[in-house]
From Swiss-Prot:
It comes from Halobacterium salinarum (strain ATCC 700922 / JCM 11081 / NRC-1). Binds 1 zinc or iron ion per subunit. Its EC number is 3.5.2.7. This is Imidazolonepropionase. One of its GO terms (molecular function) is zinc ion binding.
Length: 417
């Protein structure tokens, strides 16, 4: 027998997802959504939804009068599993020390690698669970989590196991990415390490939960050809390619992503309109991470070149993510939406789409409707104490998430009928 899990009704604005044509939001005034057996069963005007799914019959009924209801945020780029504390590096950066100089001195990624290697399995699971808790409280219901702080086969596999263990017990839907090629360990050179990733790490990682293989394609890290080798090998093991590309320099990672038909290319601070066109032609989702530029005091990526390149093409024009990591310590997609509008001058509707439906495409989840509220999609529903989606960027620095439902079950907040 079907179960009416939840009815959220009376929303001043209900955000469904991309409108017909895909380039703007479909919204309803006085909107409602009903969730049955974990999936959206009805969405539309409150009177129509309540006539078919009375609130008094629901396990959870939420009166969203005066509020905005939208799909749960999708965060397509995080390094949420880590150990240790690098807040002292934050202070050094404020004094003007470049991140690459910190990395060269054994800080940055390599410092976190040492902490992760020293952490117990239980500590890794607990650390990730704590990060997911905060993400969920800020409205994220689907999140990618990368490895990459192991840099050896044993620790990378321990990270994969920890991600799987935390994900199995958490309401956030976790998508796992193998990132063995996150940095070059200080006891080897890049070519030798690439061989180790291909020969040792990838065969072991293929037995775990990873869906994607990512590489940090950047000057003084991994070249385009080294990245290609790793991603080709990952694909042979069933892992779809992703890239960190054009973050500090324009090295050619975006074009590589296009050549490979990668699922996404991420960062892209130094990408050009030609790169944007190549990604759009290849159906690669660009993932912009404005919080990283914010904390590093770098110029923001230009979303308009990606939006323009995507015109009249299929696929998501652009996505947004937090890049949650010890160097960019934010869990809030709402904050990222605000940065996208106030820093990168995105329209609020575009920013909300880039944090929901378009972000799902960066995880190859767009086809199943993740990041939308349509009949048959997962019942991941966000209730925000604001009169419209515009207030997400308009009111920065405030977590106005009032309730989060995952598969129709209250995970954060709630309220009465």
């Amino acid at each position: 027998m079907s179960s009416l899990d939840a009815v959220v009704h009376g929303a001043r604005e209900l955000v469904v997802g991309p409108a017909a044509g895909g380039d703007t939001l479909e919204t309803h005034a006085d909107g409602a959504v009903a969730v049955v057996d974990g999936a959206v069963a009805a969405v539309g005007d409150t009177a129509d939804v309540l006539a078919a799914y009375p609130a008094e019959n629901a396990t959870t009924a939420i009166d969203a009068t005066g509020k905005t209801v939208l799909p749960g945020f999708v965060d397509p780029h995080t390094h949420a599993l880590f150990a240790g504390d690098r807040s002292d590096e934050f202070a050094a950066k404020l004094r003007g020390k470049p991140y690459q100089e910190i990395l060269a001195e054994g800080g940055g990624i390599l410092r976190t690698v040492d902490a992760v290697r020293a952490a117990s399995d239980a500590a890794l699971v607990a650390n990730l669970t704590a990060q997911l808790d905060v993400m969920l409280a800020h409205g994220t219901t689907t999140a990618e989590v990368k490895t990459g702080y192991g840099l050896d086969t044993e620790t990378e596999c321990r990270m994969l196991d920890a991600i799987a263990a935390a994900a199995a017990e958490h309401p956030v839907d976790v998508v796992t990415t193998f990132l063995g090629a996150h940095a070059v360990p200080d006891d080897t050179d890049a070519d030798a390490y690439v061989d180790a990733v291909i020969d040792d790490q990838l065969p072991a990682a293929a037995n775990g939960p990873a869906r994607f293989c990512d590489v940090f394609c950047e000057a003084d890290v991994f070249t385009v050809e080294q990245s290609r080798r790793i991603l080709d090998a990952g694909r042979e093991h069933g892992l779809a390619p992703k890239l960190h590309a054009e973050e500090f320099t324009r090295l050619g990672g975006a074009q590589l992503a296009a050549d490979l038909g990668a699922t996404s290319a991420d960062h892209l601070l130094h990408a050009t309109p030609e790169d944007a066109a190549a990604l759009a032609d290849a159906g690669v989702t660009p993932v912009l991470l404005p919080a990283t530029a914010f904390v590093l005091d770098e110029a923001y990526a230009d979303p308009q070149q990606f939006l323009a390149a995507a015109d009249n093409r299929t696929g998501a024009p652009v996505a947004l993510g937090t890049d949650l990591n010890p160097n960019c310590y934010t869990h809030s997609m709402g904050f990222v939406v605000s940065l996208a509008c106030n820093g990168m001058r995105m329209a609020p509707a575009d920013a909300v789409l880039a944090a929901t439906a378009w972000a799902a495409s960066a995880l190859d989840r767009g086809r199943d409707g993740t990041g939308t509220l349509r009949e048959g999609t997962d019942g991941d529903v966000l209730v925000v104490d604001a009169p419209s989606h515009v207030h997400l960027p308009y009111n920065p620095g405030v977590n106005n998430v009032e309730a989060v439902l995952t598969d129709g079950t209250v995970a954060v907040g709630g309220g009465g009928a």
